[in-house]
């Protein structure tokens, strides 16, 4: 019997897998990988060069090639500076690393050297990329201007915070990165050296040091290098503590609702940071002294421990000094006396915020003019309202949020055209020269609805929109539609009372719209393919013309670059449709086009279109801002602490040419950018006069100012040093919030600023203003806290001044003035209005309320106006809101009417209205059907006689009596709706339904069947 001998070594012996090697295959694979990598790199470079080339062609076509070269050169130069600076700072450490490691192993020392070089190069690339990304800050630093005003805490010119401090932070980040990398590398060398020196004797460490070197040499060099890097870090920490003091000026103190150093910062943290500057320098000196003292001794772990102790001691000391004294001072001194303790900080915040946001007079900058309001009363019809015919003539009953859907149904004319959601609210002089408020919609190309969408149609044929549509803000058509002043079948006059600037006859002007708010995809014009223009015009197909602000593609590389970078493929490159006269239009969105030639500007979200009264040309105007988040002690809104409407940008809707007008060339940021891009900004004095007449106060700036003003307005008639100011601010006693309104479902939503034509207190001339009402702070729940406490209006007359003022109208705390929320609440609880909403809901219609308009009259009263839209049953998927009613109200009452005059008649219970209020168009009459189209058998408007002649056919006397009653009740129904007497209208409708039911029964016996009537509803018919 054989014996089995088990050998564990055999069981656990590692066996190498059998590998069949193919040297030829390995070489081919390596070559393929290298070729693939080279191709990828070349493709990336080619795509980047194509994008650069197209951008150069585009900017050159606009006459602003410096906008291409200035950022590019700045970024390249800064990248090289960052590359060399960071690479050199890290590269200084490489020889030390290599020499130190050579004392351990000569081959490892050589590897360390090349590895260090690679690290230095990578660090340089990172540093260069970081610095190149700061190109705007660097250019501003080089061209910066003093503000001529200093912050109230550190008394440094505001330009230091805006222009200088960001660059210091950027350079500091590079230095910190290089110092930390050097310290980490030295620490690695020291750690390896100590590990080898103190390795157990039984561990056999095979060392191959360079000739004449040892592990002790490696440790010594590593310690010296680590100490030098640590000393550099202490110096940087000292500088950081110094500049951290200035960063306190932009820190937010949310607990107390202000920005800037608080009481603890001023009295504790700033002195601590000043002390830490000195302490950090002492630590740097101590580190250098330690290195000098121990440089000639044999290095030991004790030296390393000393260095570690210095670093740890600094971290503990800095942390303790910046936290413990603060906590003690806050608890012992600030919290028990917070109001008086924070008074100085509040004063500083109010001073800086009012300056930064243009809420105080600062030379030529906008100022807030406070206009007192008289004791608020209920407006009387023949005194208050009649005293202000300018406001009455422009009461806005049409709502810009609903108008796009209406125009897309009434005046879209083609499926591939659409009206953008941003309706322009503007003013034009009427035939009498009086300023008239209108709303203007722009008929742009609907890029998603182009018929037979393909590359040719999208790029060469359907290239532009066509014309505008203007409507009256105050008139309502017979079926609840807006009164179109111009634009129906584009550029044909419809309403004889249209403002002259909109009174086109279709023979002049350039109505084509190549640049708009929705026009985004690139196109090519002036090609061998005619463009579709408009079917009812003589030029149904056309070429755009040579004046277009596009670029040509006359060589293969330009054509290929444009095809790939802008059109995402080779279709354009392979197409034979473009010719030598063709021009490519890119960046066709108004905002995008402006930002592409002025990357330093932030463009307002609501560009508006203007018609030239002489040529009919259409021009886009967009407000653009210079802004920064580095302004000290100023309120911060969405990361912005300083904002100025620096530029009025004009874009020709047809040619897409852009002109930038500087509102105030002396403003520091504007002046700096003008120096960086000479010739880019033009003085606003060069703007054509017809454009100046349409300039308006910018919406985004005003919205931000409203947010800031709601709290910095506290006691703005008193000096900020007055103790009452800090007291009221601390308690938020006089803080405001934008007023809220109610939606039909009861949801409270903030009101937004509205462009209105009205008369401001102290000025009898109607003006075009941007207005916002305020309620007490944090009054979102409604009730008594939702009263109106103030309103703020921004004038827009740039023909008088380049900086129209803000007009603030505080209403005082002693008067309870109802606000939009309370007006909406009264409307929702009004029996007649509630009944109408219920009836509409039962018929399947939907109520949509427009914006609440608050109109001041005679410096002592307010009138509330809100449009009441009805959406028919939405089963068809078509949105067609129609303005069926207007809700008006005062302090004590509300009323409903089918137009503003009828609503006022119901509100004041009169039929005698002031001159100018009589409707010029037929008021909408409630339709008995929710269908969006007229009923074919609608009852005609009755005559004055309540009886009607029966139709031929031999009706019985009973049938004739019912028919006569039907006619009478129909007349009553229309009269009741016109007067806003909804209760009586409901009774008339019930009588009509009863008559129809009775008549149906009588006629059925004779073989005649009446159509089944639908439930009555005021839903409009288009």
Where are each of the predicted segments found?
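Soluble extracytoplasmic regions of secretory-pathway and membrane proteins
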Residues: 3-30, 35-979, 983-1020
């Amino acid at each position: 019997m054989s014996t089995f001998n088990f050998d564990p070594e055999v069981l656990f012996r590692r066996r190498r897998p059998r590998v069949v090697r193919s040297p030829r295959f390995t070489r081919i694979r390596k070559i393929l990988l290298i070729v693939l990598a080279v191709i990828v790199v070349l493709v990336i470079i080619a795509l980047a060069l194509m994008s650069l080339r197209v951008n150069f062609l585009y900017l050159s076509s606009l006459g602003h090639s410096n906008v291409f070269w200035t950022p590019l050169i700045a970024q390249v130069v800064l990248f090289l500076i960052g590359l060399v600076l960071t690479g050199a700072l890290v590269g200084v450490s490489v020889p030390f690393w290599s020499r130190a490691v050579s004392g351990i192993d000569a081959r490892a020392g050589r590897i360390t050297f090349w590895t260090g070089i690679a690290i230095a190069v990578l660090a340089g690339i990172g540093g260069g990329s970081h610095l190149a990304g700061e190109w705007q800050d660097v250019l501003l630093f080089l061209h910066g201007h003093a503000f001529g005003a200093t912050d109230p805490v550190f008394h440094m010119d505001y330009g230091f915070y805006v222009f200088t401090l960001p660059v210091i932070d950027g350079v500091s980040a590079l230095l910190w990165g290089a110092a930390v990398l050097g310290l980490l590398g030295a620490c690695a060398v020291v750690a390896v050296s100590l590990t080898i020196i103190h390795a157990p004797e039984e561990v056999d460490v095979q060392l191959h040091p360079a000739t004449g070197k040892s592990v002790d040499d490696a440790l010594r060099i590593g310690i010296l290098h680590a100490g030098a890097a640590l000393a550099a870090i202490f110096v940087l920490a000292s500088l950081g503590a110094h500049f951290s003091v200035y960063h306190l000026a932009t820190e937010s103190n949310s607990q107390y609702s202000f920005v800037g150093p608080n009481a603890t910062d001023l009295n504790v943290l700033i002195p601590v940071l000043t002390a830490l500057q000195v302490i950090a320098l002492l630590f740097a000196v101590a580190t250098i002294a330690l290195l000098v003292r121990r440089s000639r001794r044999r290095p030991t772990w004790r030296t390393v421990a000393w260095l570690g102790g210095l670093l740890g001691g600094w971290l503990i000391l800095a942390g303790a000094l910046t936290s413990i004294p603060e906590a003690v001072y806050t608890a012992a001194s600030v919290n028990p006396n917070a109001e008086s303790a924070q008074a100085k900080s509040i004063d500083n915040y109010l001073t800086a915020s009012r300056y930064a946001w243009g809420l105080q007079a600062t030379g030529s900058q906008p100022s807030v003019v406070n206009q007192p309001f008289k004791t608020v009363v209920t407006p009387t019809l023949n005194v208050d309202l009649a005293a202000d015919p300018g406001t009455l003539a422009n009461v806005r009953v049409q709502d810009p949020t609903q108008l796009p859907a209406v125009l897309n149904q009434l005046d879209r004319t083609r499926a591939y055209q659409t009206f953008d959601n941003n309706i322009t609210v503007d003013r034009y002089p009427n035939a009498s020269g009086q300023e008239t408020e209108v709303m203007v919609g722009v008929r742009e190309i609907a890029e998603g609805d182009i018929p037979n969408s393909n590359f040719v149609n999208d790029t060469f044929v359907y290239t532009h929109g066509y014309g505008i549509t203007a409507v009256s803000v105050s008139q309502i058509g017979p079926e609840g539609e807006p009164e179109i002043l111009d634009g129906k079948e584009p550029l044909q006059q419809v309403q004889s009372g249209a403002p002259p600037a909109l009174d086109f006859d279709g023979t002049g002007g350039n109505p084509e719209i190549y640049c708009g708010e929705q026009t985004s995809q690139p196109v090519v014009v002036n090609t061998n393919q005619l463009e579709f223009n408009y079917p009812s015009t003589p030029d149904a197909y056309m070429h755009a013309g040579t004046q277009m602000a596009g670029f040509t593609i006359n060589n293969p590389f330009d054509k290929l670059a444009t095809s790939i970078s802008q059109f995402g493929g080779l279709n354009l490159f392979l197409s034979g449709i473009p010719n030598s006269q063709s021009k490519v239009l890119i960046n066709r969105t108004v905002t995008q086009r402006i930002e592409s030639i002025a990357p330093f500007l932030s463009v307002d979200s609501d560009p508006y279109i203007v018609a030239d009264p002489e040529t009919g040309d259409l021009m886009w105007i967009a407000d653009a801002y210079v802004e920064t988040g580095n302004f000290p002690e100023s309120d911060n809104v969405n990361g912005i602490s300083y904002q100025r409407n620096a530029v009025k940008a004009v874009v020709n809707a047809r040619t897409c040419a852009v002109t930038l007008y500087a509102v105030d060339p002396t403003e520091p940021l504007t002046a700096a950018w003008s120096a960086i891009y000479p010739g880019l900004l033009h003085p606003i004095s060069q703007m054509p006069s017809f454009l100046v007449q349409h300039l308006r106060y910018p919406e985004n700036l005003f919205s931000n100012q409203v947010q800031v003003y709601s709290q910095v307005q506290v006691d703005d008639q008193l000096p900020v040093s007055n103790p009452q100011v800090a007291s009221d601010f601390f308690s938020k006693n006089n803080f405001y919030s934008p007023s809220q309104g109610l939606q039909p479902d009861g949801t409270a939503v903030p009101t937004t600023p509205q462009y209105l034509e009205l008369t401001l207190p102290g000025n009898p001339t109607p003006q075009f203003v941007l207005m916002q009402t305020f309620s007490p702070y944090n009054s979102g729940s409604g009730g008594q806290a939702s009263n109106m406490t103030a309103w703020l209006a921004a004038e827009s007359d740039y023909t008088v001044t380049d900086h129209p003022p803000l007009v603030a109208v505080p209403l005082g705390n002693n008067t309870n003035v109802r606000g939009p929320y309370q007006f909406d609440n009264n409307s929702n609880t009004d029996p007649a209005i509630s009944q109408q909403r219920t009836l509409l809901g039962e018929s399947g219609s939907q109520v949509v309320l427009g914006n609440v308009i608050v109109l001041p009259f005679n410096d002592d009263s307010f009138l509330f106006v809100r449009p009441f839209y009805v959406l028919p049953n939405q089963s068809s998927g078509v949105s067609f809101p129609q303005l069926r009613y207007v809700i008006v109200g005062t302090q004590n009452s509300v009323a409903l009417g089918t137009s503003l005059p009828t609503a006022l008649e119901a509100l004041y219970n009169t039929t005698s209205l002031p001159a100018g209020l009589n409707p010029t168009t037929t008021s909408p009459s409630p339709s008995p059907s929710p269908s969006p189209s007229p009923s074919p058998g609608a009852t005609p408007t009755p005559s004055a006689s309540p009886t009607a002649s029966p139709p031929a056919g031999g009706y019985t006397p009973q049938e004739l009596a019912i028919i006569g009653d039907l006619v009478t009740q129909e007349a009553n129904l229309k009269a009741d709706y016109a007067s806003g007497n909804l209760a009586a209208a409901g009774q008339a409708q019930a009588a009509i339904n009863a008559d129809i039911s009775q008549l149906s029964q009588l006629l059925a016996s004779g073989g005649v069947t009446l159509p089944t009537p639908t439930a009555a509803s005021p839903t409009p018919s288009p």
